[in-house]
């Protein structure tokens, strides 16, 4: 490590020279000047010119470091300075010679590494007093993590929350450790798992991360890289008991660490690498070097780099950053370290060090030296500029994989122990309680055992009826011998007058009933090994979804999606609901997508965000809406009729005329008769299982996923009991469970050969195909109402991602519950996205969707956004959206019955166009062997030529034709194997470009009949390091097809990590079908806005009366959001927090902030509970093509910005004089800048109070003022509007700005206070405008011109040297414009914008101060 100490008050600077090695130590080395030849040097000597004075730079470090490649590269460049000579002290001299014998030097670069005698180096520096590049005394501190953390804390640099456990016999009070199952308490500080345990010595790299039992438990053990491993997963969950450690909070970082390399206080290079905690496998490129991804640092992170550099007095210094929740935390300081393999960095580093040394020492040597003007302006190293592709954003909504049957049991409990447990865990706050954690489930089990013991002693009384239920509760909780929150959960709901009375609506006054709890035990529903394989396969397939990827990522060619951006890990966001199977599916998907290895637990903890924490996948599923209750009642009524379906039943049950629904009703005919048959088949099934249990040969029979015959019988006999009620009527709600169970047994336990199972599957599927989709609404209106109720936050999230990704690329993966997938599809089908009578492609898509009977596991809805750079930024042609869909894994029904889609990205039949665009994806798919029938071509006609044709998909330009390199990631059956994409294009000629053109498998089309098994090919390609020639693929039928059994692939059974029991079959997944590929961004945005607005309008009307009575003076924060009371007390200046005043929440990546990292929303609607804590997420984009904001600069008043197409109004780093408007800063922290300038914070507070009231009175949409207000204080520049929402928002803008101006006029005394120029910014905040969103027109820009005074000098002072963060403003402009278009509080990860307009009024003045 290197430190810079300024000896005797000198400023720290550095110069380098290259010279003698070990053998030539006594003499001064000769400066190496590569540009001079030997003869020129000889001529110089012959002329006997007096030698120029030379500054000698000594390198004092271990040989391994001083002769390393980066050091050699930098020293060679340093020697190009005419007056610098470098000498390297040999290791022998350093270790064995006394310091008096060391050669003298004027400047010393010395740093500690293993075995280095730091004491001697310190003694040498005292003896010779050279100029030190890296301070030596501070290097003692860097070796102790406790000291590093102490110094960082003193400097106000953000750290993860931590506690030190010193096991020192002399100080026993510092060694208080209490370990629980899922947490540890260190000296009073509690750290719930996951947490990190670091040895106090910085030289000890054995860092352990402990995982919570809900994610599978165990720990990840990190160590210094050994070969290709940097960590290993261990099932051990107990912390180490010897040695001193630092315990700190685990930061969820999307699976990357950012390494920052500072050279002096003004230069920092950053790289991201895969976190060793993820799977422990080191990613290496073709040369065997660890793969790193360049990263852009934010202004805040550059400031952190400067602080670290100065605090530790190390000119050359490396440290580790964790980017989590929109913040950047320093977790390690490494001292002296160089970037590897970056020529740009070597040049910059040598230049900075040379200039530093010359600036410091040239005056002493009378060397004429003037620093080159550009020397200090070395640019921050940008990301690798790889050509920006047209694909801007991919949002995929994916259902979880294959799972065990879900089971549940309800029981009413009244025992005081259950009430005590309910109270203990805070159930009375909401009246509901969900218990999932192991210790909570253990408490339930303890109570159950106690009650059963009491019942044995004294049977009788009311509890007697529940003995069976208590027994079942006990057996389920004891089922696996250990608890994992992923398996089971207990929900309890409080009923003040008993469950029965509450449900039957009895009058509680008439009879006083005792309160009771309804206990619902849910178990099963675990992801099976097959489900895990499906998710991994799909992840691998997604990797190649984007054509044109020639990049080599971890040995896989053609990783298109990953090439969206070299820092793709920062853009990839994977959200999952809190269901264990959903989280595990998401982790397995991430594993496949990112080519990870090993256990799922570390991947789950690092990569998968729980979307329930922020409400993204929330829906109040437990309490059904009134509409759902009505629908369920009608559905049950229709299906209880013991008569064949008549025409009126078809009208009542299938008003949408869905093909699959009509087909199922035809199969059913008489619903009660079918239920009778189903019940008889279930009875027969349980009888067969009981017989099998009597058979001595079945004693040790293991079913799939470790199930036993007893458990299987329990599953079926419970359904048998519950399906037919005592009255003889059937419980229709059990039909999905019956289908679930029989599907599972036919697929996984077929070896039992149970008779009647196939018939039971056929009948239950027919019933389920009616019940499941119709539970989400029977008529179009009901379907839409229920759908939006389920997935409103999800819709807002999708809309927001689409709106923001024209700025940078993003990849979002959402893993929701089944209800969200059904609902989202309903929104697209019934919400009126397009008029199917006018659009032939959409009509075909709707026909296809209506023919799909089941949204099976791994169903995908994929939205892709493209940008055409050749189009005008404001035209509708600029941004283009495609909608794709796959119904998930193939069911067990016959192949022929599957509906045929339109193929993946179907193109028009204009051959000329096909020829000109040779790089298109379809052309990359090879022709099909002539003997293979084309299912899609036979069943779906080619689209006719003519005006109704959709436009061709925009395809990626900058790439060669046929450059696609794809290896199919699965093996599958011949007639329609696993393909990510299907296509109904006619076969085109095959291009002879090696394996690259053989994109069989993945995009394999219906045109191509199968896919080959990737693992073998990948291994082959990797070991032989070459592409397979086309000839080698001629006989791919014989070579590469894996025998398939009944459409199920067994390909992954041979993978040891997949944990297959026996040889279970993994169903293949239907390829993606394109629903539409000619949508404009404007169409989709308008559609989603309309749906959200309709829903919130309805809610607003429902609660309007309540709202008016509660708070008539305050209107909602924007026209379409559900009204709610806004409490805004006078703004208090907060206490100074530990965070430094300059701190702003940094992004998870500046380069690409499109994929929000943790969506939050402030929707007050109780149906979507969002976390109460304000998120600390915020995204900044430093490089932006965007329009800026009005910024007040001293002496210039308000600068007007013209609104022009792509014109950049000012550079991202415009001027150090302009204070950045950090509007996205969380309001917890905004007071800090104010405290920096105490003399003006008071007026600012006054004016905020004055401003907050008018800004709350934003009119509701119904009261929008229509007339244009023409006030002398406003300059309104109107841009032609295209859409209605724009007009509405401009009216809103005008209204707010009128009030702000009015306020300014009325409070002239306050306005004349020093802060007045700042408060006027509030008006502008409301009037930010949209940037570059294709067809969405830019908003009216309203400039509050009148009393704009200059910002006084002292206001600006704290912000000297900051760059204006244009990107952030542009993003917020986009975001706030969305708000004004009527999408209330879009849940917006990683970039908070103020929740209510009155909050904006309060925040902005403070922040600018």
Swiss-Prot record:
Ranges annotated as spanning the membrane: none
S-S bonds: none
UniProt keywords, alphabetically: ATP-binding, Cell membrane, Cytoplasm, Kinase, Membrane, Nucleotide-binding, Phosphoprotein, Transferase
Domain of life from the UniProt record: Eukaryota
Phosphoserine: modified positions: 920, 963, 1013, 1049, 1121, 1128
Binding residue positions for ATP: 145, 198, 205, 224, 248-251, 257-259, 275, 320, 332-334
Residue stretches of biased makeup (Polar residues): 981-996, 1110-1119, 1163-1178
Protein's UniProt name: Inositol hexakisphosphate and diphosphoinositol-pentakisphosphate kinase 1
Organism the protein comes from: Pongo abelii
């Amino acid at each position: 490590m290197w430190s810079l100490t300024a000896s005797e008050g000198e400023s720290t600077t550095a110069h380098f020279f290259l010279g003698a090695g070990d053998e030539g130590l006594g003499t001064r080395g000769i400066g190496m000047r590569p540009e001079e030849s030997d003869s020129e040097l000889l001529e110089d000597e012959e002329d006997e010119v007096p030698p120029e004075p030379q500054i000698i730079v000594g390198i004092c470090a271990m040989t391994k470091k001083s002769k390393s490649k980066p050091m050699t590269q930098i020293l060679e460049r340093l020697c190009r300075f005419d007056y610098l000579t470098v000498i390297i002290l040999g290791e022998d001299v350093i270790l064995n010679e006394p310091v008096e014998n060391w050669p003298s030097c004027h400047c010393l670069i010395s740093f500690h590494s293993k075995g280095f005698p730091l004491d001697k180096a310190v003694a040498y520096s005292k003896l010779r007093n050279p100029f030190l590049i890296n301070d030596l005394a501070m290097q003692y501190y860097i070796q102790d993590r406790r000291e590093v953390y102490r110094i960082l804390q003193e400097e106000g640099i953000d750290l993860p929350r931590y506690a030190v456990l010193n096991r020192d016999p002399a100080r026993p009070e510092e060694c208080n450790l209490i370990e629980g199952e899922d947490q540890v308490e260190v000296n009073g500080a509690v750290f719930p798992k996951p947490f990190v345990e670091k040895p106090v010595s910085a030289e000890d790299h054995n860092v352990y991360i402990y995982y919570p039992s809900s994610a599978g438990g165990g720990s990840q053990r990190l160590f210094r890289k050994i070969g290709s491993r940097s960590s290993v997963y261990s099932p051990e969950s107990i912390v180490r008991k010897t040695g001193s450690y630092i315990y700190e909070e685990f930061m969820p970082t999307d699976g990357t660490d950012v390494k920052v390399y500072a050279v002096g206080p003004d230069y920092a290079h950053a790289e991201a690498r895969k976190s060793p905690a993820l799977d422990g496998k080191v990613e290496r490129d073709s040369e065997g070097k660890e793969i790193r991804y360049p990263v852009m640092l934010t202004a805040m992170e550059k400031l952190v780099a400067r602080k670290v550099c100065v605090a530790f007095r190390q000119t050359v210094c490396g440290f580790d950053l964790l980017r989590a929740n929109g913040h950047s935390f320093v977790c390690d300081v490494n001292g002296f370290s160089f970037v590897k393999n970056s020529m740009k960095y070597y040049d910059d580093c040598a230049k900075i060090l040379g200039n530093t040394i010359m600036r410091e020492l040239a005056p002493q040597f009378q060397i004429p030296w003037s620093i080159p003007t550009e020397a200090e302006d070395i640019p921050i190293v940008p990301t690798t500029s790889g050509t920006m592709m047209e694909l801007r954003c991919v949002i995929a909504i994916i259902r979880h994989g294959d799972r065990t049957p879900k089971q549940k049991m309800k029981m009413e409990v009244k025992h005081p122990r259950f009430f005590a447990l309910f109270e203990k865990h805070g159930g009375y706050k909401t009246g509901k309680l969900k218990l999932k954690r192991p210790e909570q489930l253990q408490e339930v089990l303890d109570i159950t055992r106690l009650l059963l013991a009491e019942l044995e002693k004294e049977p009788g009384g009311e509890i007697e009826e529940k003995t069976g239920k208590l027994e079942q509760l006990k057996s389920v909780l004891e089922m696996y011998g250990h608890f994992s929150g992923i398996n089971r959960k207990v929900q309890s709901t409080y009923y003040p007058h008993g469950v029965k009375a509450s449900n039957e609506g009895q009058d509680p006054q008439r009879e006083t009933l005792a309160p009771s709890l309804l206990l619902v035990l849910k178990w099963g529903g675990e992801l099976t090994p097959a489900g895990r394989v499906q998710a991994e396969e799909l992840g691998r397939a997604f990797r190649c979804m984007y054509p044109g990827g020639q990049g080599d990522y971890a040995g896989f060619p053609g990783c298109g999606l990953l090439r969206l951006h070299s820092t793709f890990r920062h853009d990839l966001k994977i959200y999952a609901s809190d269901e264990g199977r959903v989280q595990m599916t998401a982790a397995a998907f991430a594993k496949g997508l990112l080519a990870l290895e090993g256990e799922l637990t570390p991947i789950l903890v690092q990569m998968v965000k729980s979307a329930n924490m922020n409400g993204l996948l929330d829906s109040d599923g437990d309490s059904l809406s009134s509409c759902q209750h009505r629908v369920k009642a009608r559905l049950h009524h229709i299906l209880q009729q013991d008569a064949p379906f008549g025409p009126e039943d078809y009208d009542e049950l299938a008003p949408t005329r869905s093909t699959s629904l009509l087909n199922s009703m035809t199969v059913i005919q008489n619903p009660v008769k079918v239920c009778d048959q189903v019940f008889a088949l279930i009875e027969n099934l349980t009888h067969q299982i009981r017989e099998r249990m009597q058979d001595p040969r079945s004693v040790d029979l293991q079913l799939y996923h470790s199930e036993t015959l007893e458990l299987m019988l329990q599953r079926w006999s419970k359904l048998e009991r519950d399906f037919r009620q005592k009255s003889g009527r059937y419980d229709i709600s059990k039909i999905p469970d019956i289908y679930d169970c029989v599907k599972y047994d036919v697929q996984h336990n077929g070896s039992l050969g149970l008779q009647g199972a196939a018939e039971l599957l056929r009948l239950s599927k027919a019933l389920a195909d009616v019940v499941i989709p119709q539970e989400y609404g029977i008529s179009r209106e009901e379907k839409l109402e229920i759908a939006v109720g389920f997935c409103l936050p999800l819709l807002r999230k999708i809309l927001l991602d689409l709106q923001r990704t024209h700025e940078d690329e993003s990849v979002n993966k959402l893993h929701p519950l089944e209800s969200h997938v059904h609902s989202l599809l309903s929104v697209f089908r019934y919400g009126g996205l397009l008029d199917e009578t006018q659009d032939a492609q959409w009509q075909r898509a709707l026909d296809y969707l209506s023919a799909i009977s089941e949204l099976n596991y791994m169903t995908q809805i994929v939205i892709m956004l493209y940008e055409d750079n050749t189009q005008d930024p404001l035209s509708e042609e600029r941004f283009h959206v495609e909608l794709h869909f796959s119904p998930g894994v193939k069911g067990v029904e016959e192949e022929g019955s599957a509906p045929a889609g339109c193929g993946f990205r179907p193109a028009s039949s204009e051959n000329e166009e096909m020829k000109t665009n040779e790089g298109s994806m379809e052309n990359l798919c090879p022709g099909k062997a002539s003997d293979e029938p084309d299912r899609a071509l036979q069943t779906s006609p080619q689209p006719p030529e003519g005006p109704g044709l959709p436009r061709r998909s925009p395809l990626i330009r900058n790439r060669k034709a046929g450059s696609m390199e794809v290896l199919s990631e699965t093996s599958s059956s011949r007639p329609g194997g696993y393909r990510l994409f299907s296509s109904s294009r006619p076969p085109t000629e095959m291009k002879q470009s090696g394996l690259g053109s053989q994109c069989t498998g993945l995009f394999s089309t219906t045109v191509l009949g199968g896919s080959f098994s990737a693992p073998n090919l990948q291994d082959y390609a990797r070991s032989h390091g070459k592409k397979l020639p086309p000839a080698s693929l001629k006989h791919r039928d014989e070579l590469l097809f894996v025998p398939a059994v009944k459409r199920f692939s067994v390909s992954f059974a041979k993978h040891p990590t997949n944990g297959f029991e026996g040889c279970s079959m993994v169903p293949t997944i239907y390829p993606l079908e394109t629903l539409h590929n000619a949508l404009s961004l404007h169409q989709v945005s308008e559609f989603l806005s309309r749906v959200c607005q309709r829903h919130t309008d309805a809610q607003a009307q429902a609660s309007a009366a309540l709202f008016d009575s509660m708070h008539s003076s305050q209107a909602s924060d924007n026209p379409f959001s559900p009204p709610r009371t806004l409490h805004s007390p006078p703004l208090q200046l907060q206490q100074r927090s530990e965070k430094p005043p300059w701190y702003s929440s940094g992004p998870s990546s500046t380069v690409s902030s499109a994929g929000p990292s943790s969506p939050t929303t402030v929707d007050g609607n109780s149906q979507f509970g969002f976390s109460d804590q304000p998120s600390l997420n915020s995204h900044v984009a430093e490089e932006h093509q965007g329009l800026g904001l009005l910024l007040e600069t001293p002496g210039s008043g308000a600068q007007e910005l013209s609104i022009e197409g792509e014109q950049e109004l000012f550079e991202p780093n415009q001027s150090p004089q302009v204070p950045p408007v950090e509007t996205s800063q969380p309001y917890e922290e905004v007071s800090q800048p104010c405290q920096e300038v105490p003399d003006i914070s008071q007026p600012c507070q006054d004016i905020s109070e004055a401003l907050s009231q008018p800004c709350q009175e934003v009119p509701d949409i119904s009261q929008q003022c229509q007339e244009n207000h023409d006030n002398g204080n406003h300059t309104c520049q109107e841009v032609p509007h295209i859409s209605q929402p724009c007009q509405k928002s401009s009216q809103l803008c005008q209204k707010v700005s009128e009030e702000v101006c009015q306020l300014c006029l009325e409070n002239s005394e306050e306005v004349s206070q020093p802060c007045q120029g700042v408060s006027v910014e509030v008006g502008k905040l409301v009037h930010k405008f949209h940037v570059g969103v294709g067809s969405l027109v830019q908003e009216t820009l309203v400039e509050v011109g009148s009393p704009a005074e200059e910002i006084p000098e002292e206001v600006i002072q704290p912000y000297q040297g900051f760059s204006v963060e244009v990107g952030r403003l542009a993003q917020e402009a986009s975001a706030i414009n969305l708000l004004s278009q009527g999408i209330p509080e879009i849940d917006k990860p990683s970039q908070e914008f103020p929740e209510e307009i009155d909050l904006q009024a309060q925040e902005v003045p403070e922040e600018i101060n």
